[in-house]
Amino acid sequence: MIVYNVTCNVAPEIEKRWLEWIDHQLYNLSKSEKISATSILKLNTNSSENEAVYALQYQIYNRDSLQSFLNNEDQVLKKQINTVFGKSVLHFSSQLQNIKKYP
């Protein structure tokens, strides 16, 4: 299982609107046969700034599914984020491999 993570730094003034928007987008993406699960996580920060940092996580079955996801759904979603929110949402991606899961 591969975990694909997109970390998003969201400007405070658009956080509520972005969260509603991304929730709808991920709900639709979660129906993909490439993805076994999706999650929206919020990072707990001790920062005095009102920054909001979220992690969008996708559990993807295998490398082929990941590559297809990266070439299609991921590019579309990131383009939409940039179009709708511009520089109010900054994001970067990382890939993690699940080595072992404990009960």
What is each residue range found by the language model?
Residues S39-E49, Q80-P103:
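Glycine-rich beta-strand-turn "strand-cap" elements at beta-sheet edges
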Residues I2-N9, L41-N72:
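Short, well-ordered beta-strand segments in beta-rich or mixed alpha/beta enzyme
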Residues A11-I14, Q95:
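Intrinsically disordered, low-complexity regions enriched in Ser/Pro/Gly/Gln/His and often acidic
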Residues I14, D64-L66, Y102:
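Residue-level signal for secondary-structure boundary sites
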Residues I14-I40, V76-K79:
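Short amphipathic alpha-helical segments
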